């Protein structure tokens, strides 16, 4: 397999799964942005990979030197550098590609892996969301295995019946660290507050997206694209314990739920090993201890991101790309103190509204997506700057 984004949250946990299962998996290449070159080099030596890629050309020499500049006495891997390096790796000779890159820059590697016939273990939800029609046009049935805990849960629960028997998908959300706050209270949230997620350990962008529930909105769009279920049959409920990762309700009134303690190694291992399960991938539920699982309706007034995502997903075309790109810029502005917490989604909504009728249909191209993203980023920066 190839692991893209190996130094990030998903990538490091995937490597943990690989190292704890010697003989089961073989990693042949790694890629990273280039900000954690020492870690990338250490991973390369530990896994014995033959190729690494860094998006930042300035990191090429450091990556080639290996950990501590020495390479630990092993042959150093081949180093690819530049913005297209991960895309080149995605089409390399292998069985599967784990796309753990954060953001829409993961679109090109996603398309490259699918076109090359690789099994795509997808953690980079943004590539599916911004390039939905493009990705679906090249993906073969069963070629995409989702790694998001929610979509991995739906993936498993959907096996409980025929697709025609599905009444609705129920996507759970922890609610983030601010689930009981009003919109007025949310206006005072600081970056430090928002980066402290109560359940999951994630990178900064995903952590902020979880706090605003933009992440849940993206997951609703992703569920629609992965499973061809209409938006009006995809429900979001708040589940603070994050043990039930999602549910499928069938036409006879029965509901299939996937439950496990919050540990991303579980869905990662499922994706890496599919169609087989990896023994002891993560601890299971302790059924000998009393526990309470709570479910609450989502407060759409305080957290409008999910409803905005539904609107964007329904529009389709380039609208999801605009939504995602504007959000990435607004998160950056919030972290720099240029936008209040509530200003993130408010500004994204303004950019989406200004975008108007999106480019859509069978004529959608990668260039259309990139152009829409570029415009959305520039407009979001303008609005954030006041």
From Swiss-Prot:
It is an enzyme of class 1 (oxidoreductase). Its cofactor is Mg(2+); Mn(2+). This is 1-deoxy-D-xylulose 5-phosphate reductoisomerase. It comes from Kitasatospora griseola (Streptomyces griseolosporeus). Signal peptide: none annotated. The keyword Metal-binding applies. Mn(2+) binds at residues 148, 150, 219. Its EC number is 1.1.1.267. Belongs to the DXR family. NADPH binds at residues 7-10, 33, 124, 126, 203. Pfam families: DXP_redisom_C, DXP_reductoisom, DXPR_C. Catalyzes the NADPH-dependent rearrangement and reduction of 1-deoxy-D-xylulose-5-phosphate (DXP) to 2-C-methyl-D-erythritol 4-phosphate (MEP). 1-deoxy-D-xylulose 5-phosphate binds at residues 125, 149-150, 174, 197, 210, 215-216, 219. Pathway: Isoprenoid biosynthesis; isopentenyl diphosphate biosynthesis via DXP pathway; isopentenyl diphosphate from 1-deoxy-D-xylulose 5-phosphate: step 1/6. Keywords: Isoprene biosynthesis, Manganese, Metal-binding, NADP, Oxidoreductase. It comes from the Bacteria. One of its GO terms (biological process) is isopentenyl diphosphate biosynthetic process, methylerythritol 4-phosphate pathway involved in terpenoid biosynthetic process.
């Amino acid at each position: 397999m190839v692991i893209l984004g190996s130094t990030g949250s998903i990538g490091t946990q995937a490597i943990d799964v690989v190292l704890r299962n010697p003989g089961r998996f073989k990693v042949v290449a790694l890629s990273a942005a280039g900000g954690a070159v020492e870690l990338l080099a250490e991973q390369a030596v530990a896994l014995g990979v033959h190729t690494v890629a860094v998006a930042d050309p300035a990191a090429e020499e450091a990556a080639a030197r290996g950990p501590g500049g020495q390479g630990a006495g092993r042959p150093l891997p081949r180093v690819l550098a530049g913005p297209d390096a991960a895309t080149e790796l995605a089409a390399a000779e292998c069985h599967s590609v784990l796309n753990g890159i954060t953001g829409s820059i993961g679109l090109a590697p996603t398309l490259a892996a699918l076109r090359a016939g690789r099994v795509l273990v997808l953690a980079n939800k943004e590539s599916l969301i911004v390039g939905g029609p493009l990705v679906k046009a090249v993906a073969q049935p069963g070629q995409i295995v989702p790694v998001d805990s929610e979509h991995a849960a739906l993936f498993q629960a959907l096996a409980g019946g025929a697709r025609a028997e599905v009444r609705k998908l129920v996507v759970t959300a922890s609610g983030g660290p601010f689930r009981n706050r009003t919109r007025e209270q949310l206006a005072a949230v600081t970056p430090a507050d928002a980066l402290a997620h109560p359940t999951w350990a994630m990178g900064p962008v995903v952590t902020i997206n979880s706090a605003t529930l933009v992440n849940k909105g993206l997951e609703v769009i992703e569920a629609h694209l992965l499973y061809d279920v209409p938006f009006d049959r995809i429900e979001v409920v708040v589940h603070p314990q994050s043990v039930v990762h999602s549910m499928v309700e069938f036409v006879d009134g029965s509901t299939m739920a996937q439950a496990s303690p919050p540990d991303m190694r579980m869905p990662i291992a499922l994706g890496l090993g599919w169609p087989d399960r990896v023994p002891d991938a993560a601890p299971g539920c302790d059924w000998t201890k009393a526990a309470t699982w709570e479910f609450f309706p989502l407060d759409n007034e305080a957290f409008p991101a999910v409803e905005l995502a539904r609107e964007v997903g329904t529009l389709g075309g380039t609208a999801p790309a605009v939504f995602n790109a504007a959000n990435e810029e607004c998160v950056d502005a919030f972290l720099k103190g240029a936008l209040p917490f509530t200003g993130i989604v408010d500004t994204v909504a303004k950019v989406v509204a200004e975008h108007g009728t999106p480019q859509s249909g069978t004529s959608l191209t990668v260039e259309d997506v990139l152009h829409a993203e570029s415009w959305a980023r520039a407009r979001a920066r303008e609005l954030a700057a006041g």
